């Protein structure tokens, strides 16, 4: 009877983790909103927008949230002056619903975007919130043309039921 040969044991190879997709990336943070956690949240938000996951992006906002894009850099008040965007949560929902519509002719063909977020700093912190300032560059590709937008964004990030959300953004 032939003797069974033992195969040499292969060294253990660490299993590769599946890469996190934007929708799988956790938005939950520990109690403290530190710089690294805030930066990761902003990168997650940018990725959702670049991938066109607007419903997931909308889910990052609290029910009382607002989003303001001033028309001038030194604009201090969204009510007394003209703004590019000044939306509460309900208007954000309408905006997202319109973007999903096949009749959104202003986005035919759809824009492809790439956002870069940097120079993230925490301006103010408190119990369960942080006001975060960041710089951004957004490149839009559409109709064989490229447009570049840049600016400063302010986010008020809050923790609600252990989850980080946007209370306001401008």
Model segments located where?
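Short Lys/Arg-rich cationic patches that frequently serve as NLS/NoLS or arginine-rich RNA/DNA-binding motifs
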Residues: 1-23
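Short, low-complexity N-terminal intrinsically disordered segments enriched in polar/charged residues
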Residues: 15-63
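Conserved aromatic-histidine-acidic binding/catalytic patches
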Residues: 30-33, 80, 145
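A generic "alpha-helical surface" signal
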Residues: 36-40, 83, 90, 148
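Hydrophobic pocket/interface hotspot
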Residues: 45, 57, 92, 132, ...
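Short helix-to-loop capping/linker segments positioned immediately adjacent to catalytic or ligand/cofactor-binding
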Residues: 45-47, 103-110, 142-144
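A solvent-exposed, acidic/Ser-Thr-rich amphipathic alpha-helical stretch
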Residues: 63-133
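A beta-strand edge to alpha-helix "cap/lid" segment located at domain peripheries
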Residues: 114, 121-170
């Amino acid at each position: 009877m032939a003797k069974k040969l033992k195969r040499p044991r292969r060294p253990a190879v660490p299993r590769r983790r599946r890469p996190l997709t934007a929708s799988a990336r956790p938005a939950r943070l520990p109690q403290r909103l530190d710089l690294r956690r805030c930066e990761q949240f902003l990168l997650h938000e940018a990725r959702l927008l670049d991938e066109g996951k607007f419903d997931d992006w909308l889910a990052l906002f609290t029910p009382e949230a607002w989003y303001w894009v001033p028309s001038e850099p030194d604009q201090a008040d969204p009510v007394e002056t003209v703004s590019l965007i000044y939306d509460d949560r309900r208007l954000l929902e309408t905006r997202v619903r319109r973007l999903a519509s096949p009749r959104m002719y202003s986005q035919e063909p759809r824009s492809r975007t790439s956002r870069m977020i940097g120079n993230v700093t925490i301006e103010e912190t408190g119990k369960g919130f942080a006001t975060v300032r960041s710089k951004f560059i957004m490149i839009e590709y559409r109709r064989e043309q490229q447009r570049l937008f840049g600016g400063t964004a302010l986010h008020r990030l809050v923790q609600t039921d252990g989850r980080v959300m946007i209370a306001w953004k401008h």
